[in-house]
Amino acid sequence: MISPGSPPSIVALGGGHGLYVTLSAARRLTPYVTAIVTVADDGGSSGRLRSELGVVPPGDLRMALAALASDSPYGRLWATILQHRFGGSGALAGHPIGNLMLAGLSEVLADPVAALDEVGRILGVKGRVLPMCPIALQIEADVSGLEADPRIFRLIRGQVAIASTPGKVRRVRLLPVDPPATRQAVDAIMAANLVVLGPGSWFTSVIPHVLVPGLVTALRATTARRALVLNLAAGPGETAGFSVERHLHVLAQHAPGFTVHDIIIDADRVPNNREREQLRRAATLLQAEVHFVDVARPGTSLHDPGKLATALDGVRVGNQDSSAPTVAATEQIRLDGKRPQTGVNGPVGKGPRGDDAWR
């Protein structure tokens, strides 16, 4: 489905099951897909490992690796192994094998990106899976509706607590504030010809990416086509009762000046012309064109990877004339707002394998 002469480079940002479906769609267009994954999970196996070992939470990273695993029997076998979760009631209960592998390799190699690259080689991944930041983060949120007075906000900290809150999330922040972006993630965004944000948990998987200064600067600077994929339904907890337009408003509030070219939404989510016109008006906040297409798996609130791939290919071909950024432009991207970022053609080989610039 890739048009002749088009560089096959797709970057997908997100986390959890939303990112998994985007990666499953993107790999139908090209084997060279880069996943940039949130690193604030504090529940389940990931929460235990980050608390006990101080590692980047591996759960969403593991799922992204499984989504991009080779279709060979060997690749699929290792994807199954990676996802296998121990049962029982002992110390290993609830831990997926892949989480333990990534945690162990991160300690051995002293670099989470190198650990991901090594597991990716085992799986036959031709693209790359990267954490959005090289350190574990926390999310905190201002939530209303938990007190008798609806004007009073309560501070809720932690991804699991925010995702399940019965209140209304008003704003989220990352801790530490203004965290550094993973250098290879910035490189990948700058080298891409299509960047996809969403679908997924809006406040805990989508918005965190635009709260990392280095990432949002790269997203603004890249020549890639930028697409936002909206959820098929408002999720329970953090976005319960949200309209489609409200999702766009809160994204724009968290990242002033951030824009996308295209917004993809399932046609059945916005069935009548009045609602579609309201969404088009809201999309002007992001300077985006809205595409009403069939991307749902029949009878479910899940995206169909094949249909989503068709939709992504449709917006991708709108960027055929874009050229790759210059080295000078890439060097201006800052990882933490303090020091310039080395460009995609900058020196390599001075650190662990995972610290090499992406090729």
From Swiss-Prot:
**Keyword annotations:** Cytoplasm
Principal location: cytoplasm
Q: A single GO BP annotation from the record?
A: regulation of cell shape
Q: Which locations, inside or outside the cell, does it occupy?
A: Cytoplasm
What single Pfam family name could you report for this chain, choosing any that match?
A: CofD
Going by the entry's taxonomy, the superkingdom of the source organism is recorded as Bacteria
Signal peptide residues on this chain, from the entry's feature table: none
**Which InterPro entries does the UniProt entry name for this protein?**
CofD, CofD-like_dom_sf, Gluconeogen_factor
Gene Ontology terms, MF aspect: LPPG:FO 2-phospho-L-lactate transferase activity
Q: Name one GO cellular component term.
A: cytoplasm
Q: Does the keyword Cytoplasm apply?
A: yes
Q: Which family does it belong to?
A: Belongs to the gluconeogenesis factor family.
Instruction: State the name under which the record lists this protein.
Output: Putative gluconeogenesis factor
